[in-house]
């Protein structure tokens, strides 16, 4: 599997350490093992997991700006775990409401020795962080409107929402509230993955402060 991963990384132009490659392979092996009992993903084949879960997560890495990130509706830790593995200098909170998913993430953290991942079992609207995040990641939400509504309290004043989508969602964008600004749209290239992938970056438009009229 390591040789297969090396080939995919080369196609994607992603350079990581040998230790990180080994950890990514371990992640796939654990996901494949746990999936048989806990049904964590509909992708059953480890080779397909490398493409649809690992590479599909890693291509987001170059667009992560800042130090603190939260992956909302992380499922079995996607994209949070692969991103944490190749970004040991960044901190990741992985949020999900299902205990079996959080238990899996805890096991991965233990077996891979990850020190930059914090799993949290909670519904997103009930999770209240003490400090806002530089980036709020999600590939779980069906609609942008839901993501931006339920996660509105999570980014810092300068933080961004980072939504992983398939096709460019023009119709959804037209329905977004006026206080949300699309900062950037990145078309992602995932080797051997059929269909389009986009990463959309949003920010809150901050109200003007300190203006008074007499």
Swiss-Prot record:
Belongs to the methyltransferase superfamily. RNA methyltransferase RsmG family. The gene is rsmG. S-adenosyl-L-methionine binds at residues 73, 78, 124-125, 139. It is found in: Cytoplasm. SUPFAM superfamilies: S-adenosyl-L-methionine-dependent methyltransferases. Disulfide bonds: none annotated. GO terms for molecular function: rRNA (guanine-N7-)-methyltransferase activity. Specifically methylates the N7 position of guanine in position 527 of 16S rRNA. The keyword Nuclease does not apply. InterPro entries: rRNA_ssu_MeTfrase_G, SAM-dependent_MTases_sf. HAMAP family: 16SrRNA_methyltr_G. NCBIfam families: rsmG_gidB (TIGR00138). Its main location: cytoplasm. It comes from the Bacteria. Its EC number is 2.1.1.170. Keywords: Cytoplasm, Methyltransferase, rRNA processing, S-adenosyl-L-methionine, Transferase. Coiled coil: none annotated. It catalyses: guanosine(527) in 16S rRNA + S-adenosyl-L-methionine = N(7)-methylguanosine(527) in 16S rRNA + S-adenosyl-L-homocysteine. This is Ribosomal RNA small subunit methyltransferase G. It holds the Pfam family GidB. It comes from Aeromonas hydrophila subsp. hydrophila (strain ATCC 7966 / DSM 30187 / BCRC 13018 / CCUG 14551 / JCM 1027 / KCTC 2358 / NCIMB 9240 / NCTC 8049). It is an enzyme of class 2 (transferase). GO terms for cellular component: cytosol.
């Amino acid at each position: 599997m390591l040789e297969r991963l090396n080939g995919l990384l080369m196609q994607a132009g992603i350079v990581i350490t040998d230790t990180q490659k080994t950890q990514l392979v371990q992640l796939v092996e654990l996901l494949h093992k746990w999936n048989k009992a806990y049904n964590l993903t509909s992708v059953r084949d480890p080779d397909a997991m490398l493409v649809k879960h690992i590479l599909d997560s890693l291509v987001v890495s170059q667009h992560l700006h800042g130090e603190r990130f939260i992956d909302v509706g992380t499922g079995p830790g996607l994209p949070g775990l692969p991103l944490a593995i190749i970004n040991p200098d960044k901190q990741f909170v992985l949020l999900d409401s299902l205990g079996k998913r959080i238990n899996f993430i805890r096991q991965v953290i233990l077996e891979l020795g990850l020190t930059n991942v914090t799993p949290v079992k909670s519904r997103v609207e009930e999770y209240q962080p003490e400090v806002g995040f530089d980036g709020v990641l999600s590939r779980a939400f069906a609609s942008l409107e839901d993501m931006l509504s339920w996660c509105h309290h999570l980014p810092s004043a300068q933080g961004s929402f980072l939504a992983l989508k398939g096709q460019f969602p023009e119709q959804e964008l037209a329905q977004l509230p006026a206080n949300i600004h699309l900062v950037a749209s990145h078309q992602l290239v995932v080797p051997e993955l059929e269909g389009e992938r986009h990463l959309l970056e949003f920010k809150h438009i901050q109200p003007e402060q300190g203006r008074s009229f007499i």
